[in-house]
Structure formats: structure tokens, C-alpha cells
């Protein structure tokens, strides 16, 4: 039943044709079950393992590799002679890469689907209902509850369905619904109708929501929604409807794959077509078909050369290393690609409570009355330092440090705070922090008493555990709490009845200590405490006190104020009717006003500086909270989200104000707003959608079940470490310390990772360009193969893979958080950069072909043929006069391929050293700034020597050891690449970047 909160309890019962005493009949239960189904959330129908495996092969790069592997496998079957074994190495290695990538992909997908399943932990196993088939309350399985059932809940129970309250059987009913609404304190419920069709869940005080917990009290309610129709069920439906977006990096790699596939197709076809005239050469036995197959193999080698096979592994490694660095900064990343996405975050939508603030309610101001004569009223005002539950802080009057024991009013105020209180401080030795036991508001008062130390208790030498309650203990030794008159909605206050512990004739008698909403408490005060005297409360004094409280409760302060009072001569406890809560208000009249405290959930000290950093980095911070607008705007001003006098019109909205806007106005509001107050989870999702329509990359924080859909929808969902399992499962990142500063640190890390990723992607691609140029050139010129597929795989995966991974450790730029967020649609390689890496790649290809050609033409150990003979090597035969005196087998020697491979590897090592910085010279940013890179270069060269010297690797890779003279030629051809890149960097710094700055 929608909008049950609008109806009276009697109307709701009438709609379901049920009575609170009798409950549903078995017939009604059967009908309702058929109509509404079981009261449970359906299990997530995840993708089958086979579907997940198939998905991993939808990537274009992967499909090209798969095709290359299959073709290589077929060609390997037709190999003859000693190449029969080595021919299978290439397809097997490619298949291993694909299988490994698929396993990682499937594992990540399986992990990501757990968010919806985690919702089920909030479903209780059992429920208590009243039905006509049995007298009294009966326990049944929660899944069997149907709309119309009369359900009983009591303290400690998990609510089994959405209920409309019909009767509260205790003084009050308090419910912890933080998982659903994000409210940090438990909520007092009632049974009255709420005539507001647009009330948000926080305002539906006559409703209990499935999955929330009863904090205190006992009540009856009628089930108005079950299963997917509950608020929890709606969240499940929203989560199921959210399709995961591909990250900017994934989209870029997809685009890169498309471009690469087109380029590969064109080049492969071109190589094959250009050589049609050579298909019938003698080297192929005069068989046109054999010649066609030979050049087809070269085309396949080209495909293998063009694809950076090591790229997926290097990216995964770099992101994994990034997650480790982030974890040290309290940001635990669950989804690897989101590490890079953090780097282009342009908007951070942050919860207020616990993220921007400490979620540790603290008293920061208090006052007692200094003078209350007929026409004048003067107050003693104090400020208190400290923003956490740590019982340390200073009490000041103006700039002056004060000893609270010197003010009689403060001694009495501390006494009320300590005794009219059911909370305590506890020192958590494992975490090394003080924590609350009980309600946040009351814990703030407990902490205040410790800071005030009105009896000058000696606190030296106390352990932290003892320090947690030392000053409160002293007060509690003087008075004994007899009983508590619980808080109720009508009187907005609570009180305790205390008697002195010492039977001293001079000791004061029994007292009632009262705390509550200032207007309500002061209305029942007839006098005011001035020092140790009791003075009648005049209209002037009353108005002066209320004006001060109104000032604290609004504007830039926006404190939550509590009035503290006593009843000096209460009735005898024997004469009080404690079972009738309607009498409580009479016992709490004729009060003496003692003082007032103002508290707030204080901003985290480090957050203001982080918001300034975000502003400099071009990142907009938006506060989203369930709190009221006044409090939210005040906190925004304290944090620097708004200026002290800034007009917030059009920049701060409540959920209701946002709903009143047209869809286009909502879009524009999301573009300019920096504060959303009194919002529901659905608003968060709409805010994310609107921001995404402007191509903003949004980071959204959340901790409750209600936040899960928005966390899943945002590019970066950030859950709190103290949040629910559902939120953590839906998020890409979890903050172990719940601190906004950790988000900013993670964004900085994300930017650094992206910069490093650009370096190694470009490094790998320039290598691939070189390999393509090499094979293309040999095919066009009709030269013998300089590099074979298995060698290309070795270079792409191992030799290049190690330095590429080490580039992930490059130090970040010092001005990384001074730049605007990069455009997520900006290409990895474009314009000038494309030319740069093409130039390097062409040099790599030319040098590689030159090395192989040098051996044939000039090496003393080589055949020293002419270039014309080399170009026509396929026509070599004993009866061809062009090749008189030349052994045709020399054209299949391993020396030229070894020379080419050695030049390729050495140039790539020089390239890696060049990649420490995109534009800075090696003289400004030398390679030893990244010691990991130096280690990787040494390791890669060691592996290269390994395949040259250690059997059976030379056979597998078709290589042979080189002489010292040959290594000299390799270095002569390789080292100029450093000079070429330095020249290109110089042009970048002095011409290309300057033009960008002028623009």
C-alpha cells in the first residue's frame, strides 16, 4: 500500500479488512500470498560462468589476438622440418595470455555482483504476528508475512516488512533506521497520520521500514508492503536496473583497439597483395599456393607485431600497484579500472556526517546566567575546544582560559550533564580512539563533563581507559539515580530523579534533573539559577535567553541546543505514577533554568584544506546530507564550500526544492549547486545522472543501504569503512577511515597513475610501431624476415613488459593537483604526441631492418652479398647466375634475426629511460629518479642474454650468440634514439607547449 503514512491507523486497518486484536484470517493470508508473493527479496540471477567467459572475448584486441592464434595454430600443422616444434610456441603463448586475461575478468565480474546479495543480510529470519487462527502473538518465518498482517516488534528486533504503526505499547519507540535514511541518531516514532503526500522517509514518523532495528520500546504495526514493494526492495530494484558504465580508460582502450584493428587489417592485406608477384618464386618450390601461404604467415606476424600483447598485463599490474599505494592512504580500491578513473574526477559528492564531519557530536558552546534582575539579563558564555570524543579540551570565556569549578552555575550544569545521561565514553584499545556507548548527543555531554572537570579531579597518572569516565564518576558518587522519565514527543524532554548518596543533614534533598528542547523546557521554568542563588524568571530574562539560543541555532552557528534545568523540590518518588507517561509533564514543571549547551557534529580539521586543494585542482565539492538546510549550509561555510557571506540562492537545495524544478532546471541546478539537504537516495541517483549528462566524472560517497544505487551508478562509488556491506559491495572504493581527505589523496594518486600509464602505453606502442615498420619494410623490399612471430611475442610480453611496469613507479609531477581535471574523452595519443611516437617507431623499425641488412652486406662473418641479391633472395637457386658461389641456406641464418632482435631490445631499453618524463630532458629528470626502472632495464637485458646463450632457448627463439664487434654495431644503431627523443622533447617544451599556453 503506497502512502500509508497519510492515513490514520483505523483507515489502514479498514483498507486491509483486519482488526488489531484478531489479525488476518487464513483465507486472507492465502489470498494475499497469491497476490503479493513471499516477503523476501529475490536472489540475484547472475550471469552464468559461460556467459561471463564469452564476455571476456568481446574486446576487439582480444578477438584479433584470438584470430591470430587460431591462424598460427593452423599454419603450425603444415610446418615442415625443424620448425615443426617451434611453430606451436606462438599460438600456445597467445592462448595462455587470453586464458589468463579471461580468468582475471571473470573473477572481477563474480566479485562485483555481490552487492545485491548483500541486501539479504537485512532480512530477518522470523517475525511475530497476530492471526485469527491462534490466540496471542505467534512466531512465523518472516518470508510468510503478507500485507495486512498485524506485526509486533520490540527492542532488538529487525523489522520484517514495511509497517504502519497502529499502537505503541511503551513510553516511546525509537528506531535505528540509519541503514535506510542515513540518520545518525535513532528516531522517535508515533502513530498519528502525516498529511504530507511528499514526505521523505525521514519524515514518515508513523512508519517502520523493513530491515531497520528497534532501538527501544515495543509496538504493533500493520504490514503495508512486503518483498520488492518495501523501501529495501525498491533499492534492490534500482540496483538491478543500474548497468555498469565502462571507465574512461576502458573506453579509450576500446577505441584504441578499433583503430588498431583497422590499421592492422589494412597493413596485412597490403603486404599480402604487394607480394602477389613473388608467390611463384623458386623459394616456394614454384608453387603459387605455397607462396600465398608464406606471405599469409608474414601478414599474421604483422598482426602479432602490431598488438601490444603485454599491455593488458602491464595495465593490470600498474593499477594493482596503485591500489596498494592508495590502501596506505586509507582508500581501499575494489575495482582496478576505477583507480585511473579517480584521476579525471571533476565532481565529488560527499556525505556530510562522518566524512566531512567527525560524526562525533561535540559541545562547542555553553552559557549560564550571570545576572537576571528585573530589567536586565547577562550571560556567562563559554567556548569549548575539541572535535572528537577524546576527553581533552579547553574551556574559555572570550580569550581567557577558565577553571569551571569557580562558577557555581557550571558545577550544576556539569552535574545535570553527568546524571541526566545514559551514555558513556569508552576507550577502544585496538583502534586507539575514544568511542561512544549510547546516543551521540548524550555522549557529547559526557565528554563535556570530562573537559570541564568541575571538582578539579587529579587526572595525572590515569590510564586512557580510566580517563574515559574519571570526572563523571566523581559526580555520580555524590548523587544516585533512582529512575528515569523517558523522552516523549509531546514534552520534548527527559529527566532523572536523583537522591544524595550521603546522609548528611546539610546535604541537599532529592532533585530532578531535566534536559530537552530549549523552548519546551524554558516554558516550564519559573526561576533561573544565578550562581548559587535562585531568582524568578522574568519575561525579559526569558526572551534574552531564548534570543541567544535562537542565535546559536541559526546563521553561521547552527548548533543543536539543549536546555538544562532542575526541579529542586520534586514530589516524593512514592507519590509519582511512573506507569502513566501522561503525568511526566506535571512532574517536570516549576523548573529552575540552569544553562544551555550548543553542540554540533564538528567538521574534520583537515577537510577545509582539502576542499581548497580540490578547488585549485578544478574539482567541485558538493555536500549531500539528510540534515536540514540551515545546518548543511552552516557546515558548508565552515568548510569553505561556501564563502562566509556568499549568497547560496541557486547553490543550495533541499530535496523538496529540487523536486519542484523542471527536468531541465534540475540539470542546471546540478551544474551549479554545492549543497543538497534533506535528500533521499533517489535524489542521489538523479544528481549523478544529471552530472553525467554534462560529461562530469562523479565520485559519490555513501554508507547506508539507501546509497547503494547511487554508488553503483556513479563513475566512482565510495563507501565508508564503517558503512553497510551493501554499500561496500556496490562501491568501487572503500574509505577505511571514512575521511574526506583520503578521497582527495586517492584523486591525486589516480592522476599520477594516469600520467604514468600514458608513459608506458606510449612506450609499448612505439615499440609495436617499430615492429610493424620492420616487418612491413622487409616485406615491401623483399628482404628476408628480420623478426619472427615468437621473437615479437617475447619482446612484447617480457622484454618490454618489465620496463613498462616499472614506469608505473615514476614520481608524480609536483603540480599534479594544480591542473584542471583532464577530459575523459581526451585521446591517449593524438596530434603532436602521435607524430612523436610514430617518429620513434619508424626509427626503431629502420634500425632493426638496417641491423639485419648490415650482417648480410658488411659483416666479416656474413655472406657480404649485394643489396640487389638480398632483395631477390627468394629467387636463389644453384642454377641462377645471380647467386653464383652463394649458398642459398645463408638467407636462413639466425645471425641477422639476432642482430635485429638485439637492436630492437636495446633501443627499447633506451626508450624506457627516455620515458621517465613526457617532456623533461634526461638531464633534468634522470633515470635514477625511478630506481625500479633501472632494475627492470638490467633484468630485461639479462633475459635477452638468457635466450641468446642458454639452450634450448636459442633453438626456440631462432637466435645465436653475437660477437663483440656485432654488439658494437648494435649499440651504434640503438643509442641515437636517445638524441632523437631529446630533440622531440625540446620541440615539445619550447614550441608545442608554448602554443598550448598561448591558447
Curated annotation (Swiss-Prot):
Name of the protein: Sarcoplasmic/endoplasmic reticulum calcium ATPase 3
Family as reported in the entry's similarity comment: Belongs to the cation transport ATPase (P-type) (TC 3.A.3) family. Type IIA subfamily.
Subunit structure as annotated in this protein's UniProt entry: Interacts with sarcolipin (SLN). Interacts with phospholamban (PLN). Interacts with myoregulin (MRLN). Interacts with DWORF. Interacts with VMP1. Interacts with TUNAR; the interaction occurs at low levels in low glucose conditions and is increased by high glucose levels.
Tissue: Found in most tissues. Most abundant in large and small intestine, spleen and lung. Also detected in PC12 cells.
Cell membrane listed as a keyword: no
Regulation: Inhibited by sarcolipin (SLN), phospholamban (PLN) and myoregulin (MRLN). Enhanced by DWORF; DWORF increases activity by displacing sarcolipin (SLN), phospholamban (PLN) and myoregulin (MRLN).
Residues the record lists as N-acetylmethionine modifications: 1
Organismal lineage: Eukaryota, Metazoa, Chordata, Craniata, Vertebrata
Organism, scientific name: Rattus norvegicus
Annotated keywords: Acetylation, ATP-binding, Calcium, Calcium transport, Endoplasmic reticulum, Ion transport, Magnesium, Membrane, Metal-binding, Nucleotide-binding, Phosphoprotein, Sarcoplasmic reticulum, Translocase, Transmembrane, Transmembrane helix, Transport
E.C. no: 7.2.2.10
Cofactor: Mg(2+)
Role this protein plays: This magnesium-dependent enzyme catalyzes the hydrolysis of ATP coupled with the transport of the calcium. Transports calcium ions from the cytosol into the sarcoplasmic/endoplasmic reticulum lumen. Contributes to calcium sequestration involved in muscular excitation/contraction. This magnesium-dependent enzyme catalyzes the hydrolysis of ATP coupled with the transport of calcium. Transports calcium ions from the cytosol into the sarcoplasmic/endoplasmic reticulum lumen. Contributes to calcium sequestration involved in muscular excitation/contraction.
Cytoplasmic side: 1-48, 111-253, 314-757, 809-828, 918-930, 986-999
Enzyme class: translocase
GO biological process: calcium ion transmembrane transport; calcium ion transport from cytosol to endoplasmic reticulum; endoplasmic reticulum calcium ion homeostasis; intracellular calcium ion homeostasis; intrinsic apoptotic signaling pathway in response to endoplasmic reticulum stress; liver regeneration
Lineage: superkingdom: Eukaryota
Amino acid at each position: 500500500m503506497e502512502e500509508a503514512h497519510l492515513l490514520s491507523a483505523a483507515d489502514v486497518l479498514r483498507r486491509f479488512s483486519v482488526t488489531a486484536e484478531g489479525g488476518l484470517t487464513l483465507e486472507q493470508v492465502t489470498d494475499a500470498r497469491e497476490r503479493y508473493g513471499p516477503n523476501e527479496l529475490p536472489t540475484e540471477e547472475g550471469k552464468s560462468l559461460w556467459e561471463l567467459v564469452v564476455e571476456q572475448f568481446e574486446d576487439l584486441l582480444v578477438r584479433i589476438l584470438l584470430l591470430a592464434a587460431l591462424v598460427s595454430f593452423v599454419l603450425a600443422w603444415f610446418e615442415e622440418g625443424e620448425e615443426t616444434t617451434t611453430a606451436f610456441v606462438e599460438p600456445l603463448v597467445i592462448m595462455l595470455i587470453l586464458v589468463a586475461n579471461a580468468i582475471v575478468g571473470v573473477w572481477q565480474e563474480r566479485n562485483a555482483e555481490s552487492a545485491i546479495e548483500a541486501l539479504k543480510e537485512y532480512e530477518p529470519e522470523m517475525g511475530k504476528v497476530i492471526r485469527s487462527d491462534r490466540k496471542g502473538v505467534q512466531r512465523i518465518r518472516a518470508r510468510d508475512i503478507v500485507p495486512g498482517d498485524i506485526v509486533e516488534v520490540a527492542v532488538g528486533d529487525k523489522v520484517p516488512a514495511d509497517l504502519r504503526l497502529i499502537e505503541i505499547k511503551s513510553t516511546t519507540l525509537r528506531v535505528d533506521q540509519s541503514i535506510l535514511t542515513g540518520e545518525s541518531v535513532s528516531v522517535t516514532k508515533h502513530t498519528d497520520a502525516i498529511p504530507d503526500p511528499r514526505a521523505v522517509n525521514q519524515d514518515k514518523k508513523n512508519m517502520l521500514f523493513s530491515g531497520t532495528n528497534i532501538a527501544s520500546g515495543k509496538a504493533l504495526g500493520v504490514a503495508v508492503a512486503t518483498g520488492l514493494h518495501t523501501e529495501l526492495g525498491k533499492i534492490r530494484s534500482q540496483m538491478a536496473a543500474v548497468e555498469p558504465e565502462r571507465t574512461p580508460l576502458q573506453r579509450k582502450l576500446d577505441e584504441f583497439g578499433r583503430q588498431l584493428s583497422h590499421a592492422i587489417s589494412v597493413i596485412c592485406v597490403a603486404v599480402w597483395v604487394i607480394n602477389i608477384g613473388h608467390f611463384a618464386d623458386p623459394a616456394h618450390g614454384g608453387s603459387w599456393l605455397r607462396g600465398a601461404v608464406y606471405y599469409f604467415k608474414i601478414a599474421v606476424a604483422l598482426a602479432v607485431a602490431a598488438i601490444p600483447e603485454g599491455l593488458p598485463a602491464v595495465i593490470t599490474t600498474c593499477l594493482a600497484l596503485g591500489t596498494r599505494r592508495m590502501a596506505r592512504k586509507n582508500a581501499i580500491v575494489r575495482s582496478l579500472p576505477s583507480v585511473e578513473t579517480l584521476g579525471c574526477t571533476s565532481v565529488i559528492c560527499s556525505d556530510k556526517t562522518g566524512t566531512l564531519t567527525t560524526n562525533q557530536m561535540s559541545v562547542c558552546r555553553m552559557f549560564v546566567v550571570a545576572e537576571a534582575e528585573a530589567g536586565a539579563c547577562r550571560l556567562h558564555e563559554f567556548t569549548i575546544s575539541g572535535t572528537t570524543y577524546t576527553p581533552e579540551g579547553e574551556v574559555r570565556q572570550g580569550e581567557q582560559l577558565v577553571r569551571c569549578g569557580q562558577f557555581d552555575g557550571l558545577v550544576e550544569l556539569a552535574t545535570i550533564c553527568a546524571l541526566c545521561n545514559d551514555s558513556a565514553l569508552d576507550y577502544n584499545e585496538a583502534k586507539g580512539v575514544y568511542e561512544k556507548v549510547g546516543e551521540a548527543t548524550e555522549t557529547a555531554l559526557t565528554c563535556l563533563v570530562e573537559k570541564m572537570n568541575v571538582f578539579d579531579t587529579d587526572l595525572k597518572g590515569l590510564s586512557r581507559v580510566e580517563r574515559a569516565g574519571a570526572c563523571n564518576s566523581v559526580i555520580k558518587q555524590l548523587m544516585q539515580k533512582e529512575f528515569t522519565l523517558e523522552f516523549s514527543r509531546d514534552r520534548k524532554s527527559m529527566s532523572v530523579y536523583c537522591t544524595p548518596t550521603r546522609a548528611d543533614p546539610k546535604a541537599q534533598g532529592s532533585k530532578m534533573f531535566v534536559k530537552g528542547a530549549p523552548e519546551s523546557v524554558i516554558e516550564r521554568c519559573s526561576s533561573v539559577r544565578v550562581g548559587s542563588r535562585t531568582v524568578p524568571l522574568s519575561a525579559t530574562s526569558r526572551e534574552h535567553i531564548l534570543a541567544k539560543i535562537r542565535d546559536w541555532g541559526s546563521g553561521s552557528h547552527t548548533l543543536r541546543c539543549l536546555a538544562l534545568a532542575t526541579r529542586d523540590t520534586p514530589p516524593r518518588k512514592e507519590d509519582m505514577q511512573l506507569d502513566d507517561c501522561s503525568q511526566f509533564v506535571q512532574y517536570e514543571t516549576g523548573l529552575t533554568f540552569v544553562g544551555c549547551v550548543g553542540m554540533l557534529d564538528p567538521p574534520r580539521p583537515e577537510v577545509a584544506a582539502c576542499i581548497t586543494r580540490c578547488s585549485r585542482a578544478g574539482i567541485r565539492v558538493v555536500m549531500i546530507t539528510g540534515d536540514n538546510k540551515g545546518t548543511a549550509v552552516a557546515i558548508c561555510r565552515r568548510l569553505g564550500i561556501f564563502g562566509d557571506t556568499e549568497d547560496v540562492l541557486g547553490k543550495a537545495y533541499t530535496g523538496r526544492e529540487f523536486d519542484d524544478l523542471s527536468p531541465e532546471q534540475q540539470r542546471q541546478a546540478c551544474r551549479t549547486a554545492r549543497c543538497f539537504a534533506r535528500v533521499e537516495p533517489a535524489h542521489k541517483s538523479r544528481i549523478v545522472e544529471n552530472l553525467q549528462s554534462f560529461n562530469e566524472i562523479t565520485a559519490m560517497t555513501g554508507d547506508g543501504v539507501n546509497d547503494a544505487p547511487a554508488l553503483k551508478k556513479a563513475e566512482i562509488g565510495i563507501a565508508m569503512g564503517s558503512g553497510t556491506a551493501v554499500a561496500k559491495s556496490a562501491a568501487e572504493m572503500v574509505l577505511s577511515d571514512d575521511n574526506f581527505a583520503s578521497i582527495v589523496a586517492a584523486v591525486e594518486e589516480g592522476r599520477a597513475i594516469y600520467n604514468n600509464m600514458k608513459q608506458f602505453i606510449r612506450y609499448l606502442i612505439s615499440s609495436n610501431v617499430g615492429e610493424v615498420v620492420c616487418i612491413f619494410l622487409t616485406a615491401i623490399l623483399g628482404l628476408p624476415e628480420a623478426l619472427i612471430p615468437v621473437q615479437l611475442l617475447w619482446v612484447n610480453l617480457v622484454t618490454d613488459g618489465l620496463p613498462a611496469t616499472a614506469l608505473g613507479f615514476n614520481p608524480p609531477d609536483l603540480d599534479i593537483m594544480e591542473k584542471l581535471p583532464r577530459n575523459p574523452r581526451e585521446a591517449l595519443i593524438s596530434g603532436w604526441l602521435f607524430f612523436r611516437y610514430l617518429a620513434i617507431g619508424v626509427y626503431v623499425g629502420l634500425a632493426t631492418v638496417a641491423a639485419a641488412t648490415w650482417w648480410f652486406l658488411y659483416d666479416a662473418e656474413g655472406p657480404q652479398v649485394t643489396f640487389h641479391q638480398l632483395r631477390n633472395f627468394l629467387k636463389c637457386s644453384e642454377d641462377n647466375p645471380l647467386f653464383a658461389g652463394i649458398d642459398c641456406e645463408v638467407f636462413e641464418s639466425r645471425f641477422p634475426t639476432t642482430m635485429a632482435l638485439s637492436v630492437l631490445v636495446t633501443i627499447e631499453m633506451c626508450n624506457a629511460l627516455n620515458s621517465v618524463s613526457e617532456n623533461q630532458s634526461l638531464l633534468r629528470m634522470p633515470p635514477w629518479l625511478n630506481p625500479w626502472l633501472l632494475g627492470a632495464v638490467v633484468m630485461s637485458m639479462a633475459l635477452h642474454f638468457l635466450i641468446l646463450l642458454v639452450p634450448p632457448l636459442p633453438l626456440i627463439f631462432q637466435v645465436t650468440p653475437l660477437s663483440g664487434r656485432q654488439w658494437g654495431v648494435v649499440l651504434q644503431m640503438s643509442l641515437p634514439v636517445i638524441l632523437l627523443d631529446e630533440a622531440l622533447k625540446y620541440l615539445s617544451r619550447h614550441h608545442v607547449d608554448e602554443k598550448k599556453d598561448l591558447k
